[in-house]
Amino acid sequence: FLSQLSSRNIDTLVNVERVQFSDKVVALDINGVPGDVYRLYKGAFNRQPDWEGIGYWIHRVEQGGASLVQVAREFTFSPEFNRLYPANQTETAFVSQEYQNMLGRAPDIDGLNFYADSLILGRKTRPQVLADISYSPENRTVVAELVANGIDYLPWIFG
């Protein structure tokens, strides 16, 4: 941790990944696990993650060894996910909704066909598609502005 006080009363942090305050932690390593989990959360639920929720999932990945696909799989069991993506939703509709949630646009025909066919043929699961799209360079760019000042979360402290 290196802090440099400037003449304008601004602290500059160098080589710092996390800053802990009394009420939260701010993850500055937005291209690491916190950024990955944030992008997945945003894509799955079409909203910014709540501090408690993202703190739990960051912990599960960093301390528990969960992969993004495993996190996405657990998201699919939540009531919120099932309200957004009904069980009878077609693969094409699911992929289209994920593109809209994550990238803010309709899928291009190649992407739609690739992911919908992968789901139909059993080459990928919905959690895998969710993780794939969330990890895409385009989604990283879309979310970059949202996390430019870090990712706020509450650390998971319960085992």
Language-model regions: role of each:
Residues 1-25:
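Acidic, glycine-rich low-complexity segments
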Residues 17-159:
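Substrate/cofactor-recognition hotspot
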